[in-house]
Amino acid sequence: MSRSTKLTIGLIAAAALVLAGFLLIPDRGQDTPAAPEASDTAGPQLVREDSPRLSEGSSEVVFVEYLDFECEACLSLYPTVEELRAEYGDRVTFVVRYLPLHGNSLEAAQAAEAAKDQGEFEAMYKALFDNATEWGHQETSQRELFFSYAEEIGLDMERFEEVYDDPATAKRIEQSAADAQALGVTGTPTFFVDGKRLEPTRVEDLTDPLDAALEG
């Protein structure tokens, strides 16, 4: 299957989920996330110094995804983003921002942040998406499962738990959500290339802006 075909399938699947109502509706019945308290008075930023990076490209081009690890549309487009990373990852910096909308997505983001503390954000990012059907849309906390992923990755579990439970970790995620709200991001996934918001309905809506930015 070609790269273009894979990307198209991912976009079609995500679009179908939007139509089915999976994109914005959290498990708790809210249509939008509760307004978070911003921890930084300097104003909203699309990318912060502590924002997780999946890759550090050789150019100044930055691809940002606002995601919710429990979001069905994010899961559908996860392979698409992986294809983009395979194609552009050596040249483009891929940044993740959090917008938790579902019942366990905050704790999933905490797990990702705790793994990032040990230099293993990408490994946890993949574990959360690869095992999403195992933990997603559950009514109870999936903390034990997230910790099992950390063990499988080989993290220092004492340090992982310390960062996972640290109020500063939740505050960083809260800041990401506050930035999202200030930037007009209300659903996931939402993509940006060099600060410009994308509205992808076809493969070229993602690849063309990347190509143009790299050529600029």
Features from the language model and the residues they span:
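Extracytoplasmic thiol/disulfide redox context detector
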Residues: 1-101, 174-177, 212-216
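Solvent-exposed loop/turn segments at secondary-structure junctions
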Residues: 69-72, 99-104, 130-135, 168-169, ...
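Structural microenvironment flanking redox-active thiols in thiol-disulfide oxidoreductases
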Residues: 87-150
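Stable alpha-helical elements in mature extracytoplasmic
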Residues: 77-80, 107-111, 120-124, 142-146, ...
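Sec/Tat-exported extracytoplasmic proteins
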Residues: 70, 85-88, 116-119, 128, ...
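C-terminal cap of thioredoxin/glutaredoxin-like
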Residues: 1-28, 151-216
